[in-house]
Amino acid sequence: MPKRIKINVPLVLSFSDAEKQGTIQPHDDALVVTLRIGGYDVKRVMVDQGSPAEIMYLDLYKVLGLKPEDLTVYSSPLVSFKGKIVVPKGQIRLPVQAGTDLVEVDFIVVDAFSPYTAIMGRPWLHSLGAVSSTHHQKVKYLSGGQVLEIVGSQSVAR
């Protein structure tokens, strides 16, 4: 009996034009997803590969039932989308689940207006080994030998 040759083909994280199906094109929508944060399904989470940090807005912090004593000190001021200085309330580490993968994330908690509940930035994307595409409205990452994806919601982003 001849031996089978085992060929290992590396999985590639890529996006094709066919994957735009189901999205409204052309668009300039933010990538807005639902993630499980701290054990709760949280909607209106923006994925921003330009953000150097994960941000949680105070409204979400309160909805999750977290208290001021749950925060650790975070004293570096941030700059808002409008260019204003925002002093964080503090920082908190919470689990964020994507599919079956769980990543501990340090959120900077801020009291500022936002149409989003949280912003997931580069640290989360990198720890998950993920690649995002606002054009395709998806986040892709490798898990258990397969490519998994989180699909954004254009209707929520608008």
Residues of each region from the PLM?
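Short linear "hotspot" motifs
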Residues: 1-158
